[in-house]
Design a protein with these regions (language model features):
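Membrane-interface amphipathic segments in extracytoplasmic regions
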Residues: 1-284
Length: 284
C-alpha cells in the first residue's frame, strides 16, 4: 500500500496485479510530496500472526490507524483476471520458497507437480490467512471490507496503459508521476520470468479459481471457461469442503454453505452481491 498525503490518494497493492511496478513508479516520482510506502513482513500484535505489509486484506487492515485514509482519500487499485493471478501467485510462492526454487522460477514456470502442491494447500492457507500464500487470496479481500467496496478507481492489467492515462488526466496527477505511470503502462519495469500460459489454462487451476475467487468473477466481470478438477486429491478436498455437513467433519469450515452443529444450530455462509467500486463521494 502507498499513501500519498500530498495528492490525497491511496494505492492499494492487490497481489500479482502490476503492483510492484506501480509502487516503484510512485516512489520514483515522489520527490517533494509526502508519500508513505508499506512494505516487508512483520508480526501484527493485534491479529497475532505474521502479515505481509505490502498487501494486507482489508479485513486485516481495518484496525490500523491508516484505515482513516481509505475513508478520506481517493483509493486506486489494479486488478487482473483470476486465472492469470493464480498462475502468477503459484510462481511467486516458489520464488519466495527457497533460493533454489527462486532461480528455477527465473528459468521456467512451476512444474505441474509444483502447481498441484500449491493448489492443494491454498484453500487451507486462505482459512488460516497464511501470509506465505497471500498472493493467491481473492482480489475482493483487498478491495472490499466485507461487502463494502473501498476503491474509487479500478485499473485493469489488460488495458493498463489506457487506464493509467485516464487516471492521470482525471486526477490531474503531477507530470513526473504521469511520466512514470506511462512507463509502467508501456511495460517498463516488468521482471523477466518464464511464460505462464500453460499454467493459466490448467483445468485444476481454473476450477479452483472458480471456487476460491468466485466473488471476483462476479464482481469484476471476468469471463469464465468451463473447467473440472482432474487431480483426485484436490477434487476430494473441495467437494468435502463445499458440502453441507457436521461442523467437525468439514476439512475447511469457511467454504461450506452451511455448517451444522450437533446440538441443532447451524451457520450459513451468505452469497454477497458486490459492487466493484464505491459510489462517488463529495470531497471532504
Amino acid at each position: 500500500m502507498i499513501i500519498d498525503h500530498s495528492l490525497g490518494l491511496v494505492f492499494l497493492h492487490v497481489p500479482k496485479c502490476a503492483g510492484t511496478a506501480l509502487r516503484t513508479a510512485w516512489q520514483d516520482a515522489a520527490e517533494g510530496r509526502d508519500v508513505v510506502s508499506f512494505f516487508d513482513f512483520g508480526f501484527d500484535p493485534v491479529l497475532q500472526r505474521q502479515v505481509d505489509l505490502a498487501h494486507q486484506p482489508l479485513m486485516d487492515l481495518r484496525h490500523r490507524k491508516e484505515w482513516r485514509f481509505l475513508r478520506r482519500y481517493h483509493v486506486v487499485a489494479c486488478i487482473r483476471h483470476p486465472y492469470q493471478r493464480l498462475a502468477s501467485a503459484c510462481r511467486e510462492y516458489y520464488r519466495q520458497h527457497s533460493r533454489e526454487s527462486e532461480l528455477q522460477m527465473r528459468r521456467e514456470p512451476p512444474s505441474r507437480e509444483q502447481m498441484l502442491h500449491y493448489l492443494r494447500r491454498l484453500p487451507g492457507a486462505m482459512d488460516a490467512h497464511d501470509l506465505r500464500y497471500v498472493h493467491g487470496f481473492p482480489i475482493s479481500w483487498f478491495s472490499h471490507y466485507g461487502s463494502k467496496p473501498m476503491v474509487d478507481t479500478l485499473l485493469r492489467c489488460g488495458q493498463l496503459a489506457d487506464d493509467l492515462n485516464a487516471l492521470s488526466a482525471r486526477l490531474e496527477l503531477p507530470a513526473a508521476l504521469t511520466a512514470q505511470l506511462q512507463r509502467v503502462g508501456a511495460g517498463d519495469g516488468r521482471r523477466p520470468s518464464a511464460a505462464l500460459d500453460q499454467l493459466e489454462r490448467d483445468p485444476d487451476l481454473r476450477a479452483l479459481a472458480h471456487v476460491l475467487h468466485r466473488d471476483d468473477f462476479r464482481c469484476f466481470g471476468f469471463e469464465r471457461s468451463p473447467a473440472q478438477f482432474e487431480d483426485p486429491e484436490l477434487k476430494q478436498l473441495i467437494e468435502q469442503s463445499l458440502a453441507i455437513g457436521p461442523s467437525h467433519a468439514l476439512p475447511l469450515p469457511n467454504l461450506t454453505p452451511q455448517m451444522r452443529w450437533y446440538y441443532g444450530r447451524s451457520s450459513h455462509r451468505p452469497e454477497p452481491v458486490l459492487r466493484p467500486t464505491r459510489s462517488p463521494r463529495t470531497p471532504r
